[in-house]
């Protein structure tokens, strides 16, 4: 039996997204812009470069209020052109 994400979370709760994208200066700004649309707040994302420096990992934590917000953000973050993966 599959456990669904909304069965594991009790809202509101902190929820961290890890966004991997091409190492371009605008990556962090684009991630924060999308997050602000769905979960307004004051964010200080953590950025880590890949070993070769071609990609950056941006970790950002929101206070999620419902499962639809979590799912929408996964979808919207994945639509950013320079993003390769959202975890």
From Swiss-Prot:
UniProt cross-references to InterPro entries, sorted A to Z: UPF0250_YbeD-like, YbeD-like_sf
A GO-annotated cellular component: cytosol
PANTHER family assigned: UPF0250 PROTEIN YBED
Protein family (similarity comment): Belongs to the UPF0250 family.
NCBIfam families documented for this protein: PRK04998.1
Name of the molecule in the record: UPF0250 protein SG0794
Organism: Sodalis glossinidius (strain morsitans)
């Amino acid at each position: 039996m599959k456990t669904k994400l909304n069965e594991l979370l009790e809202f509101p709760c902190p929820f961290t997204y890890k966004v991997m994208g091409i190492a371009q200066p605008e990556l962090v700004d684009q991630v924060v812009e999308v997050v602000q649309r769905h979960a307004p707040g004051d964010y200080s994302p953590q950025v880590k470069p890949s070993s070769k420096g071609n990609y950056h990992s941006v970790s950002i934590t929101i206070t999620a209020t419902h499962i639809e917000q979590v799912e929408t953000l996964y979808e919207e973050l994945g639509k950013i052109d320079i993003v390769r993966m959202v975890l």
